[in-house]
Design a protein with these regions (language model features):
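Ligand-binding "clamshell"
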Residues: 98-106, 127-131, 242-254, 316-318
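Conserved C-terminal helix/tail region of periplasmic/extracytoplasmic solute-binding proteins
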Residues: 325-357
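Extracytoplasmic ligand-binding site segments that recognize negatively charged/polar headgroups
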Residues: 83, 88-229
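A ligand-binding cleft/hinge motif common to bilobed small-molecule-binding domains
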Residues: 93-96, 226-227, 231-249
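Early extracytoplasmic/lumenal segment of secretory-pathway proteins
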Residues: 7, 22-96
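Periplasmic-binding protein-like
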Residues: 199-208, 246-270, 316
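Mature extracytoplasmic/periplasmic domains
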Residues: 269-329
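Short beta-strand->loop
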Residues: 104-115, 133, 249-260, 270-272
Length: 357
């Protein structure tokens, strides 16, 4: 009888152990699935070694995808097919996603490294109090030129590009707002102008630039400049920075009429499945050392004040890429234009592109 009870007790103990082991494996599987983090960013816009470092430190597996335009990113978030946990929209797209109630309200207590950010780049008009977004990188649109090819030129005005001596030697970034803004700026209008007449005037004025334009290009613009396929370019500051800092023959200027001051940001979409992981990732990127490493790799200007102090002096003190407060007074941040005006910009840009053929 005693042996019988021992067998029963042993069976019960074994059963309990089996249940505990089964529960442990299920729990581990659930934890693993929850610890995937879906990140959606611009191409070539993060030092991938930092992602590996984050994975090693946290045990969270990062599923990393890229996009090539705000519109493509916005469409995917609206569609909701993939539940991205962190995305990187520009300022005017933050406004659009915010209006559509597609962004999570941020808990700053979960991002302690937010203290590293420069107050000059916080609480901006597109997101007061940074309720929905945290700045990641910022920059401008300006003129990059070869000083050896054009030693007597300063390119301090958009109007300088129209001179016939630059025939077939100017490269333009492939962006509707960036190029139409050039025409608007030159005519004294706002970069966020919605007046169809003004947009049409800017387009008409750009047609006068056409003989000087060699091409409207994408990521290959750097290679084309290095291969002397163009000696003047309208580019984002992050494209210009590596060329200027590595080769004294280049210079980058913001024309006196003004230009765009843009911001790319980190946000958490409403549909995010791993919001805690998203906060960890954002906080990780805002760490001073991580941000400095990322900034040197990407090449754009960082709003992270603590990180900036770790950058080489020639980088952090370069006013061309870290414009002073006074300089910023003549720069404009993009706003959401609304679909009608955005269509007007795109149509005018397409007309201009067609005129180059």
């Amino acid at each position: 009888m005693k042996r019988f009870f021992q067998l029963i007790i042993s069976a019960i103990v074994i059963g309990i152990l089996c249940l505990m082991i089964s529960h442990w494996f299920k729990s581990k599987d659930n934890t693993h699935s929850n610890e995937k983090l879906y990140v959606y960013n611009w191409g070539e816009y993060i030092d991938l070694s930092l992602i590996k470092k984050f994975e090693k430190e946290t045990g969270i597996q990062v599923v990393y995808e890229t996009f090539d335009s705000n519109e493509a990113m916005e469409a995917k978030i609206r569609n909701g097919g993939t539940h991205y946990d962190v995305a990187f929209p520009s300022e005017y797209t933050v406004q659009k996603l915010k209006k559509a109630k597609l962004l999570e309200t941020l808990n700053h207590d979960k991002i302690p490294n937010i203290r590293n950010l420069d107050n000059d780049y916080m609480n901006l008009s597109y997101d007061p109090n940074n309720r929905y977004s945290i700045p990641y990188f910022f920059g401008t649109v300006g003129i990059l030129y070869d000083k050896e090819k054009y030693p007597n030129e300063t390119f301090d005005s958009w109007d300088d590009l129209y001179h016939s001596q630059f025939k077939n030697d100017i490269l333009l970034v492939d962006g509707a707002r960036e190029i139409i803004e050039m025409g608007l700026n030159k005519l004294g209008y706002s970069l966020n102008d919605k007046n169809p007449t003004h947009i049409h005037q800017a387009e008409k004025d750009l047609h006068n630039l056409a003989p000087q334009v060699r091409g409207i290009v994408g990521d290959e613009i750097t290679m084309m400049l290095q291969q002397n396929e163009g000696h003047v370019a309208v580019v984002w500051s992050g494209v210009a920075a590596p060329l200027v800092q590595e080769n004294t023959r280049y210079n980058y200027v913001i024309p006196k009429e003004g230009s765009n001051l843009w911001f790319d940001n980190m946000v958490i979409p409403k549909t995010a499945q791993n919001k805690e992981g998203a906060y960890k990732f954002m906080n990780f990127l805002l760490d001073a050392q991580n941000s400095a490493q990322n900034t040197e790799w990407v090449g754009y200007a960082t709003p992270n004040k603590a990180a900036r102090s770790k950058l080489p002096k020639k980088v952090r003190n370069d006013y061309r890429f870290y414009p002073s407060n006074q300089e910023q007074q003549r720069l404009e941040v993009y706003k959401d234009l609304g679909q009608t005006s955005l269509s007007d910009y795109n149509e005018s840009f397409l007309n201009f592109k067609m005129s180059l053929k």
